[in-house]
Amino acid sequence: AEMLQVLAQDMGLNNLSYLGFHKTGASGSDPVIHSTYDPAWLTRYQEENYHLIDPVVDKSLEGTLPVDWSELPKVDRTTRNFFGEAMEFGVRQNGVSIPIRDHAHGKAVLTLNSDLRIHEWRKYKRGIIADAIYLGCLIQSDIVANLASAPPGPRLSTREKEVLKWAAVGKTAWETGQ
């Protein structure tokens, strides 16, 4: 997050955020989040699994073009409540989210967030979007490389898996050993 803070400042943004979905471990594709947003918002976002209802994430993951938040329909209550709550935590109205794909079929979203006035934001966005797309690819590449170099989780034998399964249903060690 420290590097993102430096990048956000250098780019004149209020916030810069990366949300990635990678197949790691037994949990499938839990999101990897690196962000300059308020830590309280990040905690809430993760605890409530907001990535499952976040219209920005949804639209970004289904497409390949940058998603300007102002172009998202905000007609349903869930979306309005989500954006309202985000604003309470300092997330600004102006944002653009960039979908990222990688060779390992990972998906991610890089989000730029600003409190510029709308006409300034549109001009700023036009001037920065190509660099932001490239930045997203660099961040994704770095994160995927770090995930690949992480030691793999423990591999369980068939018998070890069977023992865990029996323990999970309440069998004693003696019963499992029979």
What residue ranges belong to the model's regions?
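Regulatory sensory and allosteric helical modules in signal-transduction proteins
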Residues: 35-88
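Helix-to-coil/beta transition segments that act as allosteric "coupling" elements at the rims
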Residues: 80-105
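Signal-transmission/dimerization alpha-helices at domain junctions
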Residues: 131-147
